[in-house]
UniProtKB/Swiss-Prot annotation:
PROSITE patterns: TRYPSIN_HIS (PS00134), TRYPSIN_SER (PS00135)
CDD domains: alphaLP-like
Propeptide: 25-199
Keywords: Disulfide bond, Hydrolase, Protease, Serine protease, Signal, Zymogen
Family listed: Belongs to the peptidase S1 family.
One Pfam entry name: Trypsin
Reaction(s) catalysed by this chain's protein: Preferential cleavage: Ala-|-Xaa, Val-|-Xaa in bacterial cell walls, elastin and other proteins
Name assigned to this protein: Alpha-lytic protease
Annotated gene: alpha-LP
Length: 397
């Protein structure tokens, strides 16, 4: 086990296979996609990620490659597959990287850089499962509390399981790992500013209130048969809680799960109009689908408190140790967020809906926007499981 204050460990570079040729083959379609990106979204990506309009076509090409080749890459490397992600080069361009614990140094798939690492994804996931089991086995009032332990997840880029802890709580993280029985050599303890918490209960964007008491943000428009609705975070309200927008009752919470997961959907009255859009300041981003993006992909989020912010996906299958209980299967990004953004949308530049805001490492000012992007933990519940569990259809344009 090793301890760090920021992500510093890098796996060794091995080889690059035909990235230019692979991207050139997709250039026509990607250029069209870049032209379709909302101007306000381009501005936000440049502001938050340093992706300039001239770099956007090549980024979109790489993002498309990651989406279309992810399953094939995993099949190619089999049991020795150690993950894949999008990475930015020093010159500002992007590439798709795949890792393997085997000896192979290249891929038969064009446009994929291969890196050799120590542990397979299956080995790291096993350590992750031991941490989850250790947390589940704790008995409230009997077991030592997990105070100071924020979250844990597999990070393919550093080939480790990362356990995030509060500043000054490294010992708590070490104890947690030791008691779980996980292989400490596969784990990195990383300190994180702020305190992990869900993000409801402060005022603000496109918002809705719950029982005239707390405030959250709308996720995405959905339908269930003829019933209209929207998805949001489960911690925002209980079943049958009333949702209001602009003071008017628009519906009630039809179902929710929290903790364990952090998902819910609100059933709306028939008078409401569903739009396939996400607010982006004075403009809107059209929702075009719900294909999940890769680690390293650019992603933006919208909420009533901090508005429209962009970042990248930094981890998947994260377990968050909220005060209310552990929530599993979250995705982590580094777009900044604040209290009240809960339930709000996460979406890619290509209009692919990703999920709804859950929580993050919030500072005393109510957000994590002042924390360096490399240390932000902004967590969202994936959209696809919400749609599947409740039999919902995403409204797209």
């Amino acid at each position: 086990m090793y301890v760090s204050n920021h992500r510093s460990r890098r796996v060794a570079r091995v080889s690059v296979s035909c990235l230019v040729a692979a991207l050139a083959a997709m250039s026509c379609g990607a250029a069209l996609a870049a032209d379709q990106v909302d101007p306000q979204l381009k501005f936000a990506m440049q502001r938050d990620l340093g992706i300039f309009p001239t770099q956007l076509p090549q980024y979109l090409q790489t993002e498309k490659l990651a989406r279309t080749q992810a399953a094939a890459i995993e099949r190619e490397f089999g049991a020795q597959f150690a993950g894949s992600w999008i990475e930015r080069n020093e010159d500002g361009s992007f590439k798709l990287v795949a890792a393997t614990s085997g000896a192979r140094k290249s891929s038969t798939l064009g446009g994929v850089e291969v890196r050799n690492v120590r542990y397979s994804l299956k080995q790291l996931q096993s350590a992750m499962e031991q941490l989850d089991a250790g947390a589940n086995a704790r008995v409230k009032g009997v077991s030592k509390p997990l105070d100071g332990v924020q979250s844990w997840y597999v990070d393919p880029r550093s080939n480790a399981v990362v356990v995030k802890v509060d500043d000054g709580a490294t010992e708590a993280g070490v104890d947690f790992v030791a008691l779980s029985g996980a292989d400490s050599a596969q784990v990195r303890i990383e300190s994180s500013p702020g305190k992990l918490q869900t993000t409801a209960n402060i005022v603000g964007g496109i918002e809705y209130s719950i029982n005239n008491a707390s405030l959250c943000s709308v996720g995405f428009s959905v339908t269930r048969g003829a019933t209209k609705g929207f998805v949001t975070a489960g911690h925002c309200g209980t079943v049958n809680a009333t949702a209001r927008i602009g003071g008017a009752v628009v519906g009630t919470f039809a179902a929710r799960v929290f903790p364990g997961n952090d998902r819910a959907w609100v059933s709306l009255t028939s008078a409401q109009t569903l739009l396939p859009r996400v607010a982006n300041g004075s403009s809107f981003v059209t929702v075009r689908g719900s294909t999940e993006a890769a680690v390293g992909a650019a992603v933006c989020r919208s909420g009533r408190t901090t508005g429209y912010q962009c970042g990248t996906i930094t981890a998947k299958n994260v377990t968050a140790n909220y005060a209310e209980g552990a929530v599993r299967g979250l995705t982590q990004g580094n777009a900044c967020m604040g209290r009240g953004d809960s339930g709000g949308s996460w979406i890619t530049s290509a209009g692919q809906a990703q999920g709804v805001m859950s929580g993050g490492n919030v500072q005393s000012n109510g957000n994590n926007c002042g924390i360096p992007a490399s240390q932000r933990s902004s967590l969202f519940e994936r959209l696809q499981p919400i749609l599947s569990q409740y039999g919902l259809s995403l409204v797209t344009g």
